[in-house]
Amino acid sequence: CALKDELGRVSIRQVRNVVGLQGRLFTALAHSNIVVDDIVQTEQGAATMIAFTVEHEDLGDAKQIVARTLTELGEGEMSVEVGLAKVSVVGVGMKSHAGVASRMFRALGDAGIGIHNITTSEIKISCIIDHAEGQRALETVHSAFGLGLGNGATIAMQIDSSRV
């Protein structure tokens, strides 16, 4: 399990999903050496919504780049959230074990920790949460999987040996 805190999220709404939009936006961010994390895109009718997280220290520059991109497009609106964190469960054993996501989500919900965003891959499940809940979320997820904090064992081995 891992915790990454001091994150901000930039959301772009009411932009037409034109070919190349994502490349244009994220190339501009990359040229400014802004590391982007947890990208989510959804379509809402003819418009699209793109949201992504960045380290808090990069938030000001990211906002300027997004504002400039929206001005060039002549459409869209931006919103910014601060005070976020990301808690993740990581391990290659997850792709062969059903129920890892449900265990994580249930544990966070039972602890009263709200989830703002979820991203997954074959080896990772990440939840964006309020920064203030970060440490408690990490401890909650560790407990849900029967892990000790800082015990040095890999989550893949621990998931393999636990019942999901």
Q: Which role fits each region the language model picked out?
A:
Residues 1-164:
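A conserved regulatory-domain signal marking ACT and ACT-like small-molecule sensing domains
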